[in-house]
Amino acid sequence: YTFWPTFWPATLAGISYKEAWYDVDKMVDATREAMHLLDPDSFSPLIFSFGPVMEALGYKAMYWPGKGVGDNVTFQYLDDEYVSADEYDDYLFDPTGFYLKSYLPKIATAFEGFANMPRLPSLSEWRFFASLSAFADPKLQESMKQLMESGEKMAEILSAGGKFIGE
């Protein structure tokens, strides 16, 4: 069977779900302990310590341990309308543009500046060059900074997971 480590290793190791969600080293240790106990055929290499990333993103589509729910409560998706019925035509016309400019700004503050992103696909490089002025928008620049911070935090988590896989 394939072991998919989420919160059970935290319980086994005696750490809170919040600790598991925010401290990748503790979660790696907990996952290692669970792997030795269960001896699965395979396992998911992803270590679920996304708290710092979700904080940096300003993620709004879920609660997680220590943020919206208790320290020993699993994450909970928030039932909200992220795509309204009158937006389906926009989505069908330009799925990528809709995702970047409409959907993502609704689920994370780091993407709010993307609402003002230009439409980059063009057959003319002149239109593309002119559209680059949108990147001077302070909101879009702030979004880029938040995303860089989020990316750095995710790289740390993936690095810790990669070291664990290499053991």
Describe the residue ranges of each PLM region.
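Catalytic cores of TIM-barrel enzymes
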Residues: Y1-E167
